Amino acid sequence: MKITGLTRRVDSLGRIVIPKELRRMLHIKEGSPLEIYMDVDETIVLKKYSQVGSLKNISQAYAQSLSKVTGATVCVADREEIIAAAGKNHKKYIGKALSKELEDIMDKRKSALYSKKDNNLIPVVKDDKADCEAQAIAAIVHDGDSAGAVILCACDEKGDTPDIAEKLVSAAAEFLAEQLG
């Protein structure tokens, strides 16, 4: 389906400029990986590439295992959306675009704990309110770049996420980063 038709020239180095409006609409940032391939009718296609998206099945299995062990909702995200989720509230996360706050955490390439008690919970996806009691978030770092994140949302009344939860999501992030190559 064609949304808009654009004509661009290829420069002497083989580069094609993608207009800023189109990059903004498609959430393509500087340094974003793109797949380039040809269709059968000799059409050149540019497609956003998700490293973590290629691990969807492994991510889903890991999220289910971690959710069973912890009793929490566990999500795995690439740079754009939640690609795998398991647990009580998994349906409200799967396939949804990430919140700006979560993107900022992934850009920092760290792991962190958040709790309702400390009043620092963040929304995981856009247009979502942080309705869990505690969160543990770890960035999936591959080749020095953030490729996604593992998010654990605990909804028990205690409202505290022990340090072990941060270690669990960090271990999951490390495992998925290793799977990327």
Please describe what each predicted stretch is.
Residues 134-141:
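A short, aliphatic-rich beta-strand micro-motif
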Residues 56, 60-65, 98, 102, ...:
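Juxtadomain coupling helices with adjacent low-complexity linkers
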Residues 40-42, 102-118, 169-180:
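Short, solvent-exposed cationic patches
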Residues 3-4, 68-71, 132-134:
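Short, small/polar residue-rich loop motifs at catalytic or cofactor-binding pockets
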Residues 63-129:
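Structured interaction and signal-relay segments at domain junctions
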Residues 7-84:
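Intrinsically disordered, low-complexity terminal regulatory regions
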Residues 144-145:
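Glycine-biased flexible loop/turn sites that connect beta-strands or occur in inter-domain linkers
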